Structures are given as C-alpha cells and as structure tokens.
Design a protein with these regions (language model features):
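Local cysteine-cluster metal-coordination motifs and their immediate loop/turn environment
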Residues: 23-26, 63-75, 123-133
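Radical SAM enzyme [4Fe-4S]-AdoMet core and its adjacent flexible, acidic
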Residues: 1-40, 44-45, 119, 140-143, ...
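Distinct, well-ordered alpha-helical segments
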Residues: 204-210, 231-238, 300-304
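Short, intrinsically disordered, charge-biased short linear motifs at domain edges
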Residues: 11-14, 49-60, 112-119
Length: 406
C-alpha cells in the first residue's frame, strides 16, 4: 500500500444539504460532485466517473488533486489529517470493512458503502465567529453586513466578500423522503455520521433517529453537535443505539459564550453546556470533544485541558482536541504577534504532550506567519464585534496590549 493511499473513496459518501454527493468531506473545495441523491440512485452515485478516477489514482500511488486538503493539513501539522486517521485497521474494522489492502477495495461491490456522512441542513442555532454562512443559517445577518459595509482592502477573507446570489440554494435541505426511500442502504452501513448545521435543529435527524431505533440499527451513529438543544427524549433514543457524540465546543469558562455565540448573545453560557455534558456522561454515551485550537482560544487551551483531565482518567483514548485550525488563515493560532507568548504556550503544553493533538498545536505555533495576518484578524473581529455588540477583549484581555483598533 502506497504512502498516499486512502480507503475513503471505496467506503464513504458525504451528502450535502442540496443533495450533492462527494466522496469525502475534505474534498468540498474541489469539483468532486458524484451525483445528487434527489435525482440519482446509490448505484449511479457510487459508479460515478469522479469516484472511479479518484480510486484509480490512489491505487496508482498518485496524490490525487481531490485530496489536496489532507496533503496541506499534513504539511501544516506534522503529518496528521483525516486521511492518516482513515489508514488504520482500527477504523476499517470499526465501520465494518474487510481490511486495508488496496486489493480488498478493487473487489468490493461499489454500493456496499460502510459510512455515510450527511448534513441534512445548514440550519443552526449558533453563529460561531470561526464559522460562516455555508455552515450556519444564523450567520446570514452578519454575512449581509460584511457584503454591505466591510472594507476588504487587500484581504480576501475567504468568501466573505463574495455576494450570495441565491440564499435559497444555501438554505436547501435534504427531504424526509430521502430517509424512507433509502432505508435499506442506510441500515446496512457500519457508521452514520451527521453534522450540519446542528443535527438537533433538524427534523430530518429526528425522523432518522426514530427509524434507526425502530429497526434496531446495529451500526455506529456519530453526531457532531454543539449539544445546546439536547432534550431528554432524544437522549433516551440515543441510549438505545451505539451513539457517539463529538461535542463542538472551542472554548470553556467565560470564553464559551463568545466562541459559541447564540443568535441572542449569551443565551448559552458555560454552565448550560457543562450541564449538558454531564447529562450525556451520566447516560454512558461515548463522547469526544471537537475543540479546535485557533487564535480565539489560544489562552483557553490550558484551562480546557485542566478541566477535561477527569475525562482522560475515565477513558484514556477520549479525544479532547480537534485538529488545529488552518482555514480561514487569519484565525490561525500562529498569527499571534508576540513570539514570546507563543513560546510560552509551547512550553506550557509540554506538560500535556501525552494528549493527542497537543504536539500539532506546538508545531503550528512554531510556524512563521505573515505579519499582516494579525491586522487581518483584528479587522475581522472588530467588525464582527460591532455587528454583534460584543468585545473580544472582554473575553480575552490578554489581547488588549497587542490590539489594533480601527
């Protein structure tokens, strides 16, 4: 097996809110659409020429362009990406695959999908500053304000400048009928992975959950959720399945309500989310945390590791950290203008180097970044704070001595 191989194009599909299917969520930036669940059958999608080309290139040992995001992340973080996580017998077995060798996949029936990732909708009750209008409907008001009043100058700001021509396209959703029409395929999958938007915000998710419970689904149900909308009856249903919750959090204590901002700022504070986490822990549902290291939470990482140390004691392999943020580039953790501060954090993280993800933070902090990235970060945050009537300095006072106001 070559060192560029990835099993994903044989095992997985990612369904976007408009129904388009791509082989992997990391391929979203490229022309890799393999059909649409509203107009194509599963067999047509999995036999699509894009799927076939990617498979052929990976078997030939080529770095297929579709996988650029993983190559880029491996360069940025010292070798860690979604691809490197997929190339493991543990993962293959977990989703019900037959093995890792390329010869296994050349013989596989193409419709025998083992993992489906689906975003039913971009609907979300939060408008996190590191998110965008493509992932949260709550971002619409801010996006329109950026289009109207923000001075972009020489900075691109990753799509904020581009005017949305069709909001109906952005807000499309997968119909409930998709679940009923394809339940025979869904039930045979080893893993169903749902994100969004926010899954608990979507009626399609609750319909699927009822169907899985009704049919005694035996695979893994994985949710990427902010957890704020979890209700008791939903938790009871999740307990009946092999459920796994990846909790998107990105900040603890006072910072939480800033980086996980509700449409009404402060609606969900740390006490609220901590209570939800404890509730899930008591239900004995497997949880991990999607805490993405970035500039906003640079001074929050150590407190987060301290708070969650008890989880490590209960379950040694529990994920506490996500991959380091690399996009948008103005939010990268290495953009902090003070090298001494970054070196101090690198040293402090040495105590936690046994935690998966810490070394990639240290490596990211050591990466040189253009000096104007800090200016770009301040400019973006100043505008967003004005729009939302918030203040980053209130939550991260350590920034004040470096801050650039408009």
């Amino acid at each position: 097996m070559s060192d560029v191989f990835c099993p994903t194009p044989w095992l997985e599909m990612f369904i976007r809110p408009n129904g388009d299917v791509i082989p992997c969520c990391e391929m979203i930036s490229f022309d890799t659409t393999c059909g649409n669940v509203n107009t194509h059958s599963f067999e047509e999608i999995m036999n699509h020429s894009v799927y076939q080309k990617i498979r052929e290139e990976l078997i030939a040992g080529k770095k297929t362009r579709a996988c650029t995001n993983c190559w880029k992340r491996e360069d940025q973080t010292g070798g860690t990406s979604l691809r490197t996580k997929r190339v493991s017998n543990e993962y293959i077995q977990d989703i019900g695959g037959e093995g890792l060798g390329a010869e296994v996949f050349t013989k596989q029936i193409v419709t025998d999908i083992k993992s489906m990732k689906i975003d039913f909708s971009n609907g979300c009750n939060l408008k996190c500053p590191m998110c965008n209008y493509n992932r949260s409907t709550a971002w619409r008001k801010d996006k329109l304000a950026f289009e109207k009043d923000f001075d972009f100058e020489q900075y691109e700001y990753h799509g904020l400048k581009v005017k949305v021509k069709d909001w109906d396209e952005i807000f499309k959703t997968i119909p409930l009928s998709f679940i009923d029409d394809n339940i025979q395929y869904i039930l045979q999958m080893g893993e169903i992975n749902i994100s969004g938007g926010e899954p608990f915000f979507h009626p399609q998710f609750h319909h699927l959950l009822d169907k899985l419970v009704e049919n005694n689904y035996k695979g893994n149900l994985t949710l990427i959720t902010n957890l704020t909308l979890l209700e008791d009856d939903t938790l009871e249903k999740l307990e009946k399945l092999e459920s796994r919750l990846s909790i998107s959090i990105d900040g603890c204590l006072d910072l939480y309500e800033y980086v996980r901002s509700a449409t009404t700022h402060g609606k969900y504070d740390w006490n609220h989310i901590w209570g939800k986490i404890q509730q899930v822990m008591e239900a004995d549902i497997h949880i991990s945390f999607s805490y993405t290291p970035q500039l906003y939470n640079m001074y929050n990482i150590i407190p987060w590791l301290e708070i969650t140390s008890e989880f490590r004691q209960r379950q040694r392999k529990k994920q506490l950290l996500n991959e380091v943020l690399i996009s948008p580039n103005y939010l990268r953790i290495a953009n902090h203008p003070d090298k001494a501060e970054k070196d101090r954090l690198i040293q402090s993280l040495g105590f936690w180097d046994h935690v998966r993800g810490v070394k990639s933070i240290q490596q990211a902090l050591a990466q040189p970044q253009p000096e104007d990235r800090w200016i770009q970060f301040c400019k973006f945050t100043n505008f967003l704070d004005k729009q939302r009537k918030t203040s980053i300095i209130k939550y991260v006072p350590q920034f004040e001595k470096y801050w650039i106001t408009e």
